Amino acid sequence: MKKFLLTAALALVAFASAFAVTDGQTYEPVNGIKIVNSWILDRFHTPTVFPKAEYCNTRARTAVMNNGVIYIARSEVKAAVVAPGDTVPQSVIYRLDAKTGAELPALDVTLDGKPYGEFLGVNSIGRDNFGHVWVIPYTSEKTADIPVYTLNVETGELTLVTTLSKGDKIARTDYYDVIGDITREKAECNIMNAGTQVATIYRWHADQGAEEFEGGFEGDLSLEITAFFPETVTNWSYAPVVKMCYDPASETPYAGELFYIDGFNSVPALYDVTGSIIDSFEAVDKALYPEAGTNGVAEFTLDERNFMVYSIAQYAGTGHGCQANIVELGEGMSLGGMTKYWQIPADSLGQTSDGGNRVHCFNVEYNDAQDVVTLFDFKSFNGMAVYQIGKNVGGGEEPGTKGDINADGVVNVSDVTALINKILGTATYADATCDINADGVVNESDVTALINIILAGN
């Protein structure tokens, strides 16, 4: 009977949440801060499900979380008819609920009312600081201009925001970063890219209210970098990423004048707009060095502490599979003083080649009322996960909202997954939180009680 009920509950969870589960790991608190996995959908934990998803594809290279929704951009998905006998390979944006992993209706991407079918046309997707989701395509070393679009997150329609010039240095561009307001209505905007197999970086700037973007290096569109870490590196190699630093304490928080660059053979290093290295992994414990071939980094703040998350290995990493480190930065936000908190997932997302995409996407959203950070982790062709980080996550000794096993503030199918993992012994939550029917034991009857709570709430 127990096995039957757990199987039935798992079937319900799978149906409702696109077969997402939790990673089954227990992460020890550090400095009173906890991390719990809300859900995970990947090759390692859901090996019969994730590989069948349409967003498990080497053309689905980047993803972003925005306002509680995950957007996964896949180029050239299907043939769309634009005229009799004429088709284009239309791009699609797949959407998931960030709280549960449940699939939402996908968006067929259009431009000027027609199917959008550019080669790697949605290669890079992200969001600005004002909730606008943007899309920028791959461009080759023969292409001089870069179109930048905003995405209507309800219809899939693209709107051309600007066309950026590469100037005299024309290199291949893969992945981009945007800080500020891409519409320039509420703030300035800065856009950056590091060219592929060159030492060139691009930067474009527009003041609030400005019509056009200009060169972001004192008027210049690009800059040649001469300092790398490790010092033996001479260019960014393949698929580098840039991440500009948001500084809420500054009078110009969206200036992005400090930024990380993470290249194929280099590790994340912090630069300024003169091209000088401000900080690097030189003084970091060698055990925390990321391996070559994986590119991805992000920052966040919590409990007046400054954190960084960075990719530590590709799919073929030594003992790793598409994982990341979360570290607290040292005094003055120094890399050399970093303290490791956790490796996520503790086991793996997957160990399957992504065809050379190399990018590893991270971004966060803040729940200021609960002092909780939601972290989204996406590795192309291997999987994705959502984590809650804070002092009040993970099911404390005293129960909070009845049924909120993972303490993310809502009661839904992700809590059923968490409870099942508790019963199976693959996750640790307080008994007081998991004893839904208050009979003094935690077992399959609590799963039934929790499902009834969810159904009643819906």
Regions found by a protein language model. Give the residues of each.
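Conserved beta-propeller blade signature
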Residues: 69-72, 132-134, 186-192, 252-261, ...
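Short glycine/acidic-enriched loop and turn motifs that connect beta-strands
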Residues: 76-85, 139-144, 194-198, 261-267, ...
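Loop/turn-rich, solvent-exposed surfaces of beta-rich toroidal or solenoidal domains
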Residues: 266, 280-344
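Cellulosome-associated attachment modules in secreted, modular CAZymes
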Residues: 9, 13, 17, 392-458
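Beta-propeller fold detector
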Residues: 24-48, 103-113, 157-168, 211-230, ...
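Blade-loop segments of beta-propeller domains
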Residues: 88-131
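Signature of short aromatic-glycine-proline-rich micro-motifs recurring in repeat-based ectodomains
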Residues: 47-66, 113-126, 135-140, 166-195, ...
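Beta-propeller blade signature
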Residues: 88-101, 144-156, 199-208, 268-270, ...
